[in-house]
From Swiss-Prot:
The lineage of its organism: Bacteria, Pseudomonadati, Pseudomonadota, Gammaproteobacteria, Enterobacterales. The chain crosses the membrane at residues 85-105, 152-172. Disulfide bonds: none annotated. Residues 107-152, 413-457 form a coiled coil. This is SPI-2 type 3 secretion system translocon protein SctE. Component of the type III secretion system 2 (SPI-2 T3SS), also called injectisome, which is used to inject bacterial effector proteins into eukaryotic host cells. SseC/SctE2 and SseD/SctB2 are inserted into the host membrane where they form a pore and allow the translocation of effector proteins into the cytosol of target cells. Disruption phenotype: Mutant is severely attenuated in virulence. Disruption prevents SpvB-induced F-actin depolymerization in human macrophages without affecting intra-bacterial SpvB protein levels. It is a multi-pass membrane protein. Belongs to the SctE/SipB/YopB family. GO terms for cellular component: cell surface; cytoplasm; extracellular region; host cell membrane; membrane. One of its GO terms (molecular function) is protein-folding chaperone binding. Pfam families: SseC. The core secretion machinery of the T3SS is composed of approximately 20 different proteins, including cytoplasmic components, a base, an export apparatus and a needle. This subunit is involved in the formation of a pore, called the translocon, in host membrane. May form a complex with SseB and SseD/SctB2. SseB is required for correct localization of SseC/SctE2 on the bacterial cell surface. It is found in: Secreted; Cell surface; Host membrane.
């Protein structure tokens, strides 16, 4: 067995190991966490190389080599001498190294577990917030549905009202047209009745849909009846316009009758009597003008032939003749154009013209008065035609229901837009929370993978340390064998 030769007497008893035996010992690096490293063969100086070639090194050379190794380790730490190393039990050193490695791995595992726990807490908080926002979104959707339902209720009520009024007014127009012998009036009434019935069917479908009936079926009925109602109303409006045009053509003779009366000598009489005339004189002139205009206008509607009657039947025949004239007037011009109606219109037109001429003062001119009277007659004729061929009640109901429906729809749409905006914000927040939760879940998976790798590395390091201890024991056994 080889010995280590030393220049000092105190090292005479130190056992020497060959370079071959020292190089067979596996060393563990502090930065490898227990991983087995390659064998290191180092030389320190030319003298050391010579000693290695001869197979022997001195204690001083070994101390210098250890000092160079320890000086290369960073940090301010104690540098034990070679005898201290030789006196250290390698088994204890290996156990200390194993404990250190396991402690490092345990701290790392604890840190990863804490990270996983925090990630789980973040996920729970995000999930609770997401559930709360889902609940808010559902509540907003319920509110939106409730507002839409209320809007549907108001719409159905308005449709019921419009449909009922159109049906009633259509029936009245049919009766009136039948009594007056006006087929256009009857056709207009039938169109209004059809529009009203379609409107009531539409309102019934809307009511049924709100009560839980099949939505698609009710919506199809609503679409069809809406088109039918609109078409019937358009037909009724066209018939009303036709009646207005026909009546206007028939009432052109009224203006002609007024002009004829003014040109027949009544105008000169008015000029003469207006000098210093008062209210009573104006009223009398207007009354006379109305009677003459009504008589002249009614002659246009007298039958061409008149039956002969006995003396005792003259009064009855005259009354029948007057009724026929009245019927012809109302059937051709409108219900306002009776003898009394024409008389009232002519009287009002003449009275307004006379009063205006008096207010203006100056010389009373027949031409100026004539123009004023004819203009007033034209306005009153148009007003009477529009009044006869239209129903203010129906128009008022239509305007009221349509306006209320539009206002209600506008308010509901405004609230709906606000709720939809809130829902969109909640959806955006949910997507952001989903993204954060996904990132957190991915980070948890990464940390779990690192934790698994850490446990695997810890086991591998422990096995390497045990292998090192086994190898050291083998070396010790061989050394003991050599010493023996």
């Amino acid at each position: 067995m080889n010995r280590i030769h030393s220049n000092s007497d105190s090292a005479a008893g130190v056992t020497a190991l060959t370079h071959h035996h020292l190089s067979n010992v596996s060393c563990v690096s502090s930065g490898s966490l227990g991983k087995r490293q390659h064998r290191v063969n180092s030389t320190f100086g030319d003298g050391n190389a010579a000693c290695l070639l001869s197979g022997k090194i001195s204690l001083q050379e070994a101390s210098n080599a250890l000092k160079q190794l320890l000086d290369a380790v960073p940090g301010n730490h104690k540098r034990p001498s070679l005898p201290d190393f030789l006196q250290t039990n390698p088994a204890v050193l290996s156990m200390m190294m194993t404990s250190l490695i396991l402690n490092v791995f345990g701290n790392n595992a604890q840190s990863l577990c804490q990270q996983l726990e925090r990630a789980t807490e973040v996920q729970n908080a995000l999930r609770n917030k997401q559930v709360k926002e889902y609940q808010e979104q559902i509540q907003k959707a319920i509110e939106q549905e409730d507002k839409a339902r209320k809007a549907g209720i108001f719409g159905a009520i308005f449709d019921w009202i419009t449909g009922i009024f159109e049906t009633v007014i259509g029936a009245l127009k049919v009766v009136e047209g039948f009594l007056s012998g006006n087929p256009a009036e009857m056709a207009s009434g039938v169109a209004y009745m059809a529009a009203g019935c379609a409107g009531m069917v539409k309102a019934g479908a809307e009511t049924a849909m709100m009560c839980g009936a099949d939505h698609d079926t009710c919506q199809a009925i609503i679409d069809v009846t809406s088109k039918i109602q609109f078409g019937c109303e358009a037909v009724a409006l066209a018939l009303d316009v036709f009646q207005i045009g026909r009546a206007f053509m028939a009432t052109r003779g009224l203006s002609g009758a007024a002009a004829k009366v003014l040109d027949s000598g009544f105008g000169e009489e008015v000029v003469e009597r207006m000098v210093g005339a008062g209210e009573a004189e104006i009223e009398e002139l207007a009354e006379k003008f109305g009677e003459e205009v009504s008589e002249s206008f009614s002659k246009q509607f007298e039958p061409l032939e008149r039956e002969m009657a006995m003396a005792n039947e003259m009064a009855e025949e005259a009354a029948e003749f007057s009724r026929n004239v009245e019927n012809n007037m109302t059937r051709s011009a409108g219900k306002s154009f009776t003898k009394e109606g024409v008389k009232a219109m002519a009287k009002e037109a003449a009275k307004e013209a006379l009063e205006k001429c008096v207010q203006e003062g100056g010389k009373f001119l027949l031409k100026k008065f004539r123009n004023k009277v004819l203009f007033n007659m034209f306005k009153k004729i148009l007003y009477a035609l529009l009044r006869d061929c239209s129903f203010k009640g129906l128009q008022a109901i239509r305007c009221a229901t349509e306006g209320a429906s539009q206002m209600n729809t506008g308010m509901v749409n405004t609230e709906k837009a606000k709720i939809e905006k809130k829902i969109e914000q909640l959806i955006t927040q949910q997507r952001f929370l989903d993204f954060i939760m996904q990132q957190t879940e991915n980070q948890k998976k990464i940390e779990q993978k690192r934790l698994e790798e850490l446990y695997k590395g810890s086991g591998a390091a422990l096995r390497d340390v045990l292998d090192t201890i086994d190898h050291y024991s083998s070396v010790q056994a061989r050394i003991a064998g050599y010493r023996a």
